Every structure is written in C-alpha cells, then in structure tokens.
Amino acid sequence: VIKFLEKLSKGTPQHWASGSFKVRDLLKRWPATRPIRLLYIELRNSLRGLPRWRALRGADARVWTSACSSAKGPKVLVASSVGAHMIANSLDSMLAVALTLRGARVHGLLCDGALPACLACEANLWPDQQHFTKHGPSRTLCGPCFRPARRMWSGFGLPIHFLSRHLADEDRAACWRIAQTVAEAEIDSYEHLGVRAGMHARSGALRYFARGTLDEEPHALSVRRRFLAAALMATSALDRLFTAEAFDACVAHHGLYVPQGLLVDLSRKHNVRMATWNVAYRAGSFIFSHDDTYHFTLMNEPVTNWESLVLDEPLQAALDDYMQSRATGSKDWVSYQDNTGFSTSEMKERYGIDLTKPTVSAFTNVLWDAQVFYPSNAFPSMLDWLFDTVRYFARRHDLQLVVRVHPAEVRNPVRSRQTVVDELARAFPQLPDNVHVIAPTAPVNSYALARHSNAAVIYGTKMGVELSYMGIPTIVAGESWARNKGVTLDADSRAAYFALLDKLPLSGGLDEETRRRAARYAFHFFFRRTIPFEFLTVRKGAWPPFRLELADLAPLRPGRSPGLDLVCDGITKGTPFIYAAETLIRQGRSSH
C-alpha cells in the first residue's frame, strides 16, 4: 500500500507524463485525493520515515538508562516542532540521543495541533483554499503530522513539551483578535513580546503559496492573517515555556518560518544559546549556525574564519574534484543540473544564444524561498531586480543577457506556483532581441553557461560561491552567501548596481589573487561549514534523503564521529561549527 501511495505522491512512469505535467500534479489539484495523500504522509512517517528509537534504546538499555539518570549537563531544548517534517525529526532525534549520551539534559518540543498554520502547510494540500482559510490544518493535517512524531519521541523516555499545554484559551482569543484587526499594511512588521512575528508570518505565507508575491492570490490576506495568528500563538506559548524551563541551549532546523523563526528570536530574548541547522549541499552533511538562520550567518561570517587558510596540494585537489562534480551533483544530496547542453553550437541552435558576443548570465533563485528582510539588498525583491536588469540590457545592444531560471522551481519538493518564466512573459510580452531566457526544465547546464560568460549577475542564489571559484566576475544584488567575502562585486543600492553594470563588458576574469581567495572560501564553505555524519546512509531520489543506519547507540557515543562531537560541543558549549576537514584530508582520511 505504501509503495503504491508513494508512486502516486512522488512521481509517475514517463509514458504517463506530458511535458512538465504529471499525474501527481492532477492529484494535488483534485480535492478527493487529499485523504489519500494525508494517509500516505502518516503511513510513511509511521512505518519507515522516522527512526525507531524504542528498539535502539532497548539494544543499549543499560547505557541509555545510565545516561538519562546521570545527565547533569546543560539543559537543551531540541525543538523539532513540526511532526510531519521527516528530515527535521530524524536528525533532531539523533541529536537528542547524542546530547544525552554526552550528559546534556534534553527536552523535546512538538506542536500538537495548537497552531492555525505552520511550516507543514502547503497550498497544494488544500485545492479548495477556502477550506484552509476557514479551518486551517486542524481538520486534515494536524493528526497525521503529530501522531507519528509523538510515537517516535515517546521512545526516548525524555521530557517532551507540547505547544498546547503552554497556550491558554485567552491567549488564543487575544492572538486571533490581533491577527484579524491589525491593519493589512502592518501585518509584516508586527511584533509581539519583542519578537518579529509578522516577518516570520510573511515568510510562512509565501512558502505556503510557493510564491514570491501574493498579489494574484484571492485568499492571500486571509492566509496572511492566519499565519500571523499562528506566529502570535507560537510566540506566546514558547515565551511561557522558555520562562518556565530556563533552557541553556536550543536546537532548531531552518531558523525561519512558523514556528522555527520565532524560536530564534525568543532564544535571543531569553539569552538561550541557539543552534540552527539545515541540509547542506554535500551528500551526508549539514550546516549548523549559532544564534540565527544560516541565511544570515553565512553572509556575515567573519572572513578571519577562512581567509588565512592555506590550500596546499591535497586540499586544492579535493576542492577541484568536488567543484567539478557540482556540474552534475554526483557528490551532493540532489542535483538541479542536467549533464547536457555543454555545446555552444547547441545553445545557439536551440535558444538563439550567440556566445561569441559578450554575454552576461543572470542566475535566479526560487522566488518564495527564505523570504525575510535583508537590509543589504539593492532591490525590494528578486523580480524587481530581474525586471530592472532586463530593462537595462534592452539599452545595451553591445551585450547579451542570458537569464537562467533556477531548475529548483520545478524540481524542489515544494514546487513553485509562481515562476520566473511566467512573470517575465507578463512583464515583457516581447523580450529585447539581446535577452534570452532559459526555462528551469531546459537541458542547459548552468555551469557550462557560466564558463562562456563575461560576467554574471545574481540576487540570492548560492551559486555565487561557485561562480567566484570559476573566476567569473559576479555582481551581487541580493542576499547571496558570496556577499561580503571580497570575491564579488556587491551592490547595496539600485544606483550602485547599475554603476557596476555600466562597467561591462570586463576585460577579463577575476585576477589570480581574487581567485585564490574565492577558492579558500569555497573550501571553507563546502568542506568546513558542511559537517558530515558517517552513520547516515544517503538515499538519492528518496524521501527523506537519508536513513540512520544504527544497530545500537554506539555510533552516537562521544569519540565515534568527529562531526557529531563537533556539533554537540557547539550546541552545549558554543564552540564554532567549523569542521576540520583540512586536517583529515592532509592525514589521508576522507572528510565527507
């Protein structure tokens, strides 16, 4: 049954598909299939999606009992919160066990249906949006989300907190009253108990709709108010929990959306050490950050963490080997690139691109992903940047602009409901002759395109790290992680951005010293900031993309995994989340 449901949910045979439309897309639009999809979510999480800690604990009963009874270390809240998120609950629960084995007093956190909206809510689960605006997830998603996670977390014997137990009826009423009456223009900036509830509610609503703007969503305002109510309730409940328990540290995935973003703000308010994490690029590895989401910390990380790194022959060889693999994603969790389209003649024939002409490539990012306020952005949004860029190049007949739309628009598990191709077609019914758009489904490799470019312009894509490593001069207008590293041309205003464009075409690529600096940062980012866990089995093309391969608790004990030891020390002691990959490589040991 679960295999059949998985086929319905995740994909269809090729002969069932026509273009980008698949049977699964029809199922997502058909209200009658929602019970099947919800049943699939619960069965998947219950039967094989989440670790079976009760059995593993039994295999090491004496060790586990002793660890729990003797734990006298820091009090740590592992705040998975969203039960349906299999990656979060799998990794968080592993961290809970590992921290306990190192003496920490670990508590868990789950939402038990207390919130009227959250990270688990996506528009494709509610083909009838009025049902969601009226009832939220309570009648459909909350049960399948909560039940499997509760069973998994109960296998520890550790304290676990439920949001509803820290939320009084009067809190709910007050939060709903605020959410329904606050002026529309004030929703995004609304603060509650010193927390940026409105900002995180906005991020949640954009993710729900999988859109970067909500102008054309008829139920957008109702959904925004629902997410604001959820953010207010989560803030009230978590503020009460933090006051009562006096945690020393907190662990939360993402550090964005509802309720995870609120945990970051509340940890800061209560002087609780916060560690956020997310899946990294390299297969089997994760990114951890202190005190904020990695979307902020990676932009503002001190350059002293990496600029003096010496890339000797073993390190340079490891970096070059990995960076070459990025074109196909063979060493990553997932690849958004096709190993096709390398021929310049093919690009010219299929897309009208003449790479003998000075070419500037614009690489987009997913419109809705991680949309929070970035003070250094030169434009209000990626679409504003892209539209103004096209208008600029319409006047520059000496140059050619190629817009490569991010393949994740259609390959991401949360498929975008607003696409760059559609928005460009709406804004420019007739594109300028020197502007070409490559759709996310097109068999063109972004790295091959970059190699033929005089320069690149980006907004928030993470590809800025690779572009600089490749020696491509890159102008950054948004929140790319390559910003502030001394390897890109960073614009903090529209005027500064266009002044940089006026210098195009450039006479050559990045100078040798800047390329060496870019290589040092690329090694730091891909090898030192991404932390591997050896006991994970990577499952490419599956969900979740990894499985904990544990016969007992031994691999999680201190001294067994350098990456796990590093992460646990970072959570409990505040030490940097920087993995000593260079040491392992120089010793001839694989770091990933």
What are these regions (language model features)?
Residues 1-75, 79, 98, 102-231, ...:
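Conserved N-terminal ligand/cofactor-binding loop architecture of enzyme catalytic domains
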Residues 234-289:
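Conserved nucleotide-sugar donor-interacting segment of glycosyltransferase catalytic cores
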Residues 85-108, 112, 264, 379-394:
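Histidine-anchored nucleotide/phosphate-binding helix
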Residues 288, 475-520:
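Nucleotide-sugar donor-binding patch of glycosyltransferase catalytic domains
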Residues 259, 278, 285, 442-489:
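A donor-sugar binding/catalytic signature common to diverse glycosyltransferases
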Residues 228-244, 354-355, 376-377, 415-465, ...:
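Donor nucleotide-activated moiety binding/catalytic core segment of transferases
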Residues 327-426:
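Conserved catalytic-core segment of nucleotide-activated headgroup transferases in glycan assembly
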